[in-house]
Amino acid sequence: SSGAPKRTSEGKDGFGATTGMGICHSYTPDGRCVSLLKILLTNFCVYDCQYCVNRRTSNVPRARFSVDEVVKLTTDFYFRNYIDGLFLSSGIIQSADYTMEQLVAIARELREVHNFRGYIHLKTIPDADPALIAAAGRYADRLSVNIELPTEAAVERLAPEKKVHTIKLAMGSIRRKLDEKAEEPRSPKFAPAGQSTQMIGGADASDDQTILSTAETLYGSYKPKRV
């Protein structure tokens, strides 16, 4: 990737910004930079994680896209060469299964109805039915499950409605599916770009050593492409 600083036209007249609201840049294993429409299906959420701006008790404006709206945004931007793909996440609405069903429906419609061949990254909801996670992998290039924080104690304190055990079960399920695909190349497609995860630094007192140790454990246990 280029060592040049990222340009922004925020607050200025002009064009050519390399950063901007809604479009992020990611790098493929071969070094290519790809532009992704990075959006939430909704910022409504039933969870009240203390570190999240969209937590249940946060006084922020709320919005929600429909499945058709996300599909249209993605295809319109793609055909105009604004993006190379979609990075889709969501707050939790109604239930984990309901929300995951909506994410899968978007990916399914893009692939099967619109023959979309761009990149799709879906955030996976750990509490969702494993069958929904498996379905997500059939349509997405990459899946990701957030580990949230560097330690289980921090998750229990700052996001008590989430369970590290459940998060790790979801990551383990994805790893097994990826291993099965590697052993049987002719089996149905499953997240060919693998899985990734992320955690928030600075929300608790974890030092660099703790963060690096957690990342090392995750790489060893679940083989994510990126932490």
Predicted region positions:
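Flexible, acidic/Gly-rich N-terminal and inter-domain linker regions that tether
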Residues: S1-F44
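Conserved AdoMet/S-adenosylmethionine-binding subsite of the radical SAM
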Residues: V71, Q94-V227
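Canonical Radical SAM [4Fe-4S] cluster-binding loop centered on the CxxxCxxC motif
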Residues: I39-D68
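Residues forming anionic-ligand binding surfaces in small-molecule and nucleic-acid pockets
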Residues: Y47-Y51, Y82-I83, E148
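Short Fe-S-cluster ligation motifs
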Residues: L73-S89
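Hydrophobic residues within beta-strands of alpha/beta enzymes
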Residues: C52, G85-L88, L143-V145, V227
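Short acidic, glycine/Ser/Thr-rich loop/turn "cap" segments at secondary-structure junctions
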Residues: N54-V60, L86-A96, I120, V155
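Conserved, mostly hydrophobic/aromatic
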Residues: L36, C49, L88, V145, ...
